[in-house]
Amino acid sequence: MEIIEIDGSMGEGGGQILRYSLGFSAVTLKPVRIYNIRAKRSNPGLRPQHLTAVKALQMITDAVVKGAKVGSMEIYFEPKRRKPGNYRFNIGTAGSTTLVIQAILPALLFSKGYSSVEIIGGTDVPWSPPIDYMRYVFIYNLRFFGVDVEIELYRRGHYPRGGGRVVLKVKPLLGKMKPINIVERGKLISIYGISHAVRLPRHVAERQARSAATVIREKLGVEPNILIESYPPGRDPHLGPGSGIVLYADVEAGTRLGGDALGARGKRAEIVGREAAEKLIDELSSGMAFDSHMGDMLIPYMFLAGGESIAGVSKLTNHTLTAIEVSKIFLPNSKVSIVGNKGEKGIIRIHGVGLSP
């Protein structure tokens, strides 16, 4: 069988190439060799959360794997079959649970049965989507493909202690994924959010929310509905400490766009709230139906769906363009066209391969 070769330093050269390559290998059951893994990063090679994604997909597909250790620059992955089931994976650090979800979800969707996956690690950590973005924006938008997924949050995990606990519940696809055709967002309908603070005073979450709401009212003329999540001392189940806020907008096209920010030591809660609001406003300003982060997460699903998908994204990022390049290597029979320049809003048109479970 032909082995697909992926240069891990292509495009943005980060862990995303590894996640998408392994994800496509697991879905298509094509073996892959990935080299120069995270070559452009200051600490190249596999990190613990990447290793968790490798081991998770190894278990889900009974794969033969070589090179799966922290620091490894090369990995060989040969999947045998896709198995639904109940799984549990512990990253063992504050490594991102949401990036592991990104890697394993396509394989589980194309398995012939229901799956439940418990993942222990970081839920709200730098350089990855926060868990509330995944719960309220990512899986919400995946509905358009006919995908039925839930993410349950039982405990938050922040850097450096981690310890978060999430459960991914996946109903298998009954047939080919539906293509999507959603370009412009249309009118803004409403804005929601969740502002959390764990192992910290309640006023941290309240100040984040208040600051975000002030910016949204001033710039958009909308009153957002932001939930406050905090816990009384002595009854806080989290390791913490940590805080963050995720905002999301419902729009006329039926999609959701998000904006988020994380708290950090020495960073005022008001700044956290303002950052999230300004990010959301920036995403909405393009007039497109999907935000820049959703843009790159849509790509594998557009390639795997049956027929032509068209999506309007607020920004054509490096991540999105790299996701397209990796997808084309695994699915050469697909057709892609992009209107727009890198760093600007764009329209992505992909004629998917219509993979069946």
Swiss-Prot record:
Top EC category: ligase
Pfam families: RTC (PF01137), RTC_insert (PF05189)
GO cellular component entries: cytoplasm
Keyword Nucleotide-binding belongs to the record: yes
NCBIfam families the record matches: RNA_3prim_cycl
Reactions it catalyzes: a 3'-end 3'-phospho-ribonucleotide-RNA + ATP = a 3'-end 2',3'-cyclophospho-ribonucleotide-RNA + AMP + diphosphate
Location relative to the cell: Cytoplasm
Primary site of residence: cytoplasm
Domain of life according to the entry: Archaea
Family: Belongs to the RNA 3'-terminal cyclase family. Type 1 subfamily.
CDD domains according to UniProt: RNA_Cyclase_Class_II (cd00874)
Keyword Membrane included in the entry's annotation: no
Protein name: RNA 3'-terminal phosphate cyclase
Residues the entry annotates as binding ATP: 102, 293-296
GO molecular function terms noted in the UniProt entry: ATP binding; RNA-3'-phosphate cyclase activity
Residues the record marks as active site: 319 (tele-amp-histidine intermediate)
Record keywords: ATP-binding, Cytoplasm, Ligase, Nucleotide-binding
Gene name as annotated: rtcA
UniProt function note: Catalyzes the conversion of 3'-phosphate to a 2',3'-cyclic phosphodiester at the end of RNA. The mechanism of action of the enzyme occurs in 3 steps: (A) adenylation of the enzyme by ATP; (B) transfer of adenylate to an RNA-N3'P to produce RNA-N3'PP5'A; (C) and attack of the adjacent 2'-hydroxyl on the 3'-phosphorus in the diester linkage to produce the cyclic end product. The biological role of this enzyme is unknown but it is likely to function in some aspects of cellular RNA processing.
One GO process term, biological-process aspect: RNA processing
EC numbers: 6.5.1.4
